[in-house]
Amino acid sequence: MDIALLLKWILCQKVRVENAMTIKLENQLLNIKNGRNFRELGGYQTKDGKTIKKHKLIRTANLASLDENDLKYLQDYGVKYVVDFRSKDEVEREPDRVPEGATYDFDPVFSEDLTDSSKGIDEVLSQDNKDPKAGYNHMFIAYDDMIKSESAQRAYRKFFDVLLANDEENRSVIFHCTAGKDRTGFAALLALSALGVPLDTIKQDYLFTNAATTDFVNSFLQKAKDEGASDANLSNIKDLQTVHPEYIDHVIETLQQNYGGVENYLHDMMKLTDEEISKLRKIYLN
């Protein structure tokens, strides 16, 4: 085969795979009209060829803006548990609207919102920060705290307790923070890792937040610009409202360097036993 033709064929296959993954990720979005980043984790394949069941595991942003139709949709979808990773102040500002019949679990990862994802735009602008990388750099500190702080580890262990309790078919756990990207993203990494989902899939799920929240972020940035935000402020707002590959790469590297990898973290810091991991896979995998 001609080398040029071979390279062209390889490129075509790569594009097809990437397109297939994009379509798959778009299909993960739930039909919620008044919330953002509502995503089904069912359908992802594990390393050994099993598949996460639908109607079992859902990652979202907060539930504060849901209307009655959204609540009915989630009730019909089978939502049984809502795990809220936000701080007390965040919850008081924007309390969740919980579907009828679902149990609400207040499970704060931090005592305050270190990701800044819920701070009002006026507060962000009032910081008068000239460093356009301040928001980007701040996120690495926030992720370190998610991994290492005792409060975060307790919260994520409680999250696993809820996952283990959700043993009825077609009953879902919603887990969320404010934007559904950082605290929720780390929770998704832990849960998907425990279920045996490949790291490449976990990364793509994490990064899909940007596509899922494009309209919201653009609107947020436009409002900031209209209110006179500097270029540095706009850069920081964007970095606080989106995800970067470097964030999840940092998480994975930190887990490897400090704990020997995510599997060891699940056993040693989450205190998940082999029996509990087997139970999780029985509950959530086909």
PLM regions and their residue ranges:
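Ser/Thr-glycine-rich phosphate-binding loops at phosphate-binding pockets of nucleotides
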Residues: 179, 183-184
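Cys-dependent protein tyrosine phosphatase-like superfamily
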Residues: 10, 15-174, 187-286
